[in-house]
Amino acid sequence: MPVLQPVSVDVVIVGGGLAGLAAARRVDRAGVNWLLVEAADRIGGRVATDMVDGWRLDRGFQVLNTAYPRVPALVDIAALDMRYFTPGVLVRRGPALHRLENPLRDPGSTPKTLTAGVGTLADRLKFAALATRYATLSPARLLDAPETTAQEALRRAGLSHRMIEEVLRPFLSGVFADRALDTSSHVLAMVLRSFARGRIGVPANGMAALPVAVAGPLPYPQLLVGARTVSVARGMVVTDGGEIRCRAVIVATDPATAATLLPSLPRPDMRGLTTYYFGADRAPIDEPTLLLDGDRREIVANTVVMSNAAPEYAPAGKSLIAASSVGVSAPSGASEAVIRVELSRMYGVPTDDWDLLTVVTLPQALPAANVPQGNLRKQVALGDGLFVAGDHRDSPSIQGALASGWRTAGEVLTSLGALAGPPAA
């Protein structure tokens, strides 16, 4: 626990996740005095990677989308040494694996996509049209559209029940941690827009490389880790190591902690995800492609051989398989056995000799984004010099966290009379 000498700064940022780091980048660029305090012994928040006996295990299955506008604005994507997944998915339905590719990312795949054994030809044409619309319309146009649930938006697009249930529900339930697809159609539009326009992958050194890259230009002494914030008030932040006087406070913690520090702030509903990591001597498939369960078992939402995309995630000669389930399952032998059976069915290979490396349970993986969400940008200025940032104030995504932190810092700088810089993307 760092012991603070009496200190006074312009801005205190509470929380060193992506939102807090993005806010720090903007206030630092404006030349105001600031300090970031983080309770954990590292930065990154929910974006973290553990090294275990040569395995690189992210804290839950996470990916980085290169089409998120705030990502290239804050980091050099090339320097992340990205490892990319295939622009499409595989779908297990009965004894066969079917492929559905993203023709916007891989134009040569269009004939294969139209003849794939996933949904009807009409379904595939309608989905291609929907993805093209999301990819080409501006975010403002998409967010001006009438709002409904993600499931209803897919139905209104003319997609069949089978296409929704066998492909889109398993895919999107893993993205939103929402099996019912009650998530706002505005969030759906922005997420599918990014998937259509960008590439999906992970940094070679794990997802933890992202917050490290965001923090890269910041002066290290102003990132105070291992300091738990006890309370915030007008002009004051109290940590377990002392008090910090300030002109403005940005609370950029997880939503539950933010609601504790700011009692007037509604506590959002959170959604959970569970990720099972297995090690194997051989990869069950040879490609870095997300595999979905089209048989509607609703046990494994998706699975992927991480080391097919990023060999750095596994020791030499080994393969790392990630499998994600919606909700929080206890890491018991019974649930492990069920997961093994499902993965054996989906990959079409025995899984008895796979080693269960760990089970990552995230009860608060993502804030729920049910209707209504409007333009996704919730109020961040709370009065009395108090501000709040995080993906719960924007879209539930890496983009949402970064954009919220950047936007909130802009409002803080405006309130202080400092140069706010360009608007958030």
Set out the residue ranges of the language-model regions.
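Glycine-rich active-site loop/strand segments that organize a redox cofactor
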Residues: 48-67, 129-142
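Mid-domain catalytic core of redox enzymes
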Residues: 2-6, 230-336, 345-346
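Helical element adjacent to the flavin cofactor pocket in flavoenzyme catalytic cores
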Residues: 188-240, 244-247
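Conserved flavin/dinucleotide-binding core of flavoenzymes
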Residues: 4, 311-425
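N-terminal Rossmann-like FAD-binding beta1-loop-alpha1 element of flavoenzymes
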Residues: 9-36
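Short beta-strand to alpha-helix junction loop
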Residues: 62-69, 142-148, 152, 157, ...
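Glycine-rich FAD pyrophosphate-binding loop
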Residues: 28-52
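Mobile amphipathic helical/loop "lid" adjacent to a hydrophobic cofactor/ligand pocket
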Residues: 71-72, 76, 81-181, 196-197
